[in-house]
């Protein structure tokens, strides 16, 4: 599986950009990366504060082709990201449910 990467200088939100690309291209997999996000989305309708220099990233994939219960996908994704980061950063990275990663008690 090859994931198509979309790189932007600035987006309203990586989530909204992913939705727009899915509708426009019909791709099954992709990754949105941006240098800045103006109006990010948190959980339960909360606003996500975005600071320049942070990582702004959304993955999208066709869940109809995945045989994992939808409620498990968020945790699996978070743990996969933790594993990836741990290859470059050797400090302890803590998973905090439902989808946060912490280093030294600070959300990353």
Name each model feature, range by range:
Residues 92-105:
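Catalytic palm active-site di-aspartate
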Residues 1-91, 107-108:
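N-terminal lobe of the biotin/lipoate ligase/transferase fold
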């Amino acid at each position: 599986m090859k994931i198509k990467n979309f790189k932007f200088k600035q987006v309203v939100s990586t989530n909204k950009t992913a939705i727009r690309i899915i509708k426009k291209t019909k791709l099954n997999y992709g990754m949105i990366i941006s240098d800045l996000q103006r109006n990010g989305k948190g959980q339960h309708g909360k606003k996500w504060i975005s600071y320049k220099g942070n990582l702004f990233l959304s993955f999208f994939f066709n869940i109809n082709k995945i045989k994992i219960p939808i409620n498990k996908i968020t945790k699996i994704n978070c743990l996969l990201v933790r594993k990836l980061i741990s290859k470059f950063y050797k400090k302890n990275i803590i998973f905090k449910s439902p989808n946060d990663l912490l280093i030294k008690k600070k959300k990353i």
